[in-house]
A protein has these predicted regions:
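Short acidic-glycine loop/turn motifs at beta-strand connectors
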Residues: 86-89
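Substrate-binding/catalytic groove segments of enzymes
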Residues: 79-81, 91-94
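Compact, glycine/acidic-enriched structural inserts
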Residues: 93-126
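A surface-exposed partner-binding patch
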Residues: 1-83, 126-127
Length: 129
């Protein structure tokens, strides 16, 4: 029976299994599967767009012994920032690679409701503890 099912279905099932320890909210998983993955906010000052990974392309990573998921492929003007999911507190964090600054950003629902505000606030240092 398995041989008759589409391979993508099993790849997705395998990805879900791999990401189980990250405790991703269902809404976040669904968003990364359906998009839009390119977020645009032309009225913002610093960052006018960002591109998220699709669910199948989300990157597992470790930073200072913390297991995290990288959710953002790239964003406008700033290549040294990563948008990360932390399973520990079930929140988005960001990492400024150049300055080695790691700060909490928002819960997924808050972020996706106004991503331009959060990404620009991140650049301006609004969320630094």
């Amino acid at each position: 029976l398995k041989a008759l099912e589409p391979e993508e279905w099993h790849n997705e099932q395998e990805k879900l299994r791999q990401l189980m320890p990250y405790k991703l909210p269902a809404k976040l998983v669904e968003y990364l599967k359906t998009g839009p993955l390119r977020l645009e906010f032309p009225d913002q000052e610093w960052v006018k767009w960002a591109e998220l990974y699709s669910f199948m392309d989300v990157q597992e990573m470790t930073w200072k012994r913390k297991k995290l998921l990288s959710l953002m492929v790239q964003m406008d003007n700033y290549s040294d920032y990563l948008l990360l999911w932390s399973p520990r507190d079930k929140k988005l964090w960001y990492l400024d690679i150049e300055h080695e600054e790691f700060h909490p950003l928002a819960k997924w629902d808050d972020f996706i409701a106004d991503p331009g505000r959060y990404l620009n606030g991140m650049i301006e240092g609004e969320f630094e503890e």
